[in-house]
């Protein structure tokens, strides 16, 4: 945790041995490992960290760690931001970050979507673990998954690494997506 979140301190709430840890690729799914419940002393966000068994690009398998801190923090900040049009996206079961989901049917215009996404991005980037260029952000991104009446359209990155994301860049990206997918918003 110190490697990925160097500006924070954590405490172990509980730990347990688990059988059949999460695995990926052709790796065996009958390995055992450990799961810990952790709390951040800085954000008071509670999350889990656990062993997983992953396939490498070389056909070998290895133990790794999975934590859902960024996702748990995003869930808290979505609730604090208090806009029901934004929700957590949990489509990727082994993700080292959190993503958000919006549906275009909940908005009146592309400008409104862009403004809400940009304001939320500004809000969560002012909080731990998203302040500054944290090491974990360089390995992952925070994406907004955009839907149109429950049909997936595409996703856009809200992460500032490796480029700066502005209100204008979000607006341009959403406009292009909607033109490409022939999506119009209600008047």
Question: PLM features: residue spans?
Answer:
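A mature extracytoplasmic/lumenal domain signature
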Residues: 16, 42, 51-53, 92, ...
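Exposed beta-strand-loop-beta-strand "reactive/processing" segments of non-cytosolic proteins
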Residues: 8-51
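Intrinsically disordered, low-complexity segments enriched in small/polar residues
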Residues: 13, 23, 31, 55-57, ...
């Amino acid at each position: 945790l110190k490697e990925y979140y160097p500006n924070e301190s954590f405490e172990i709430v509980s730990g347990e041995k688990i059988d059949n840890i999460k695995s990926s690729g052709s790796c065996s799914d009958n390995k055992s490992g450990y799961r810990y419940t952790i709390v951040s002393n800085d954000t008071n966000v509670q999350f889990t960290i656990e062993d997983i068994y992953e396939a490498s690009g070389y056909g070998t398998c290895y133990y790794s760690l999975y934590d859902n801190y960024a996702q748990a923090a995003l869930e808290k900040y979505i609730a604090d931001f208090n806009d029901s049009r934004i929700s957590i996206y949990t489509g990727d079961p082994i993700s080292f970050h959190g993503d958000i989901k919006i549906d275009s049917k909940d908005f009146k215009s592309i400008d409104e979507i862009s403004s809400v996404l940009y304001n939320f991005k500004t809000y969560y980037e002012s909080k731990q673990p998203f302040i500054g260029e944290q090491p974990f952000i360089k390995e992952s991104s925070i994406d907004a998954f955009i839907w149109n009446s429950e049909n997936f359209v595409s996703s856009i990155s809200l992460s500032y690494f490796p480029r700066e994301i502005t209100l204008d860049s979000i607006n341009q990206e959403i406009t292009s997506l909607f033109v490409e997918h022939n999506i119009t918003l209600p008047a």
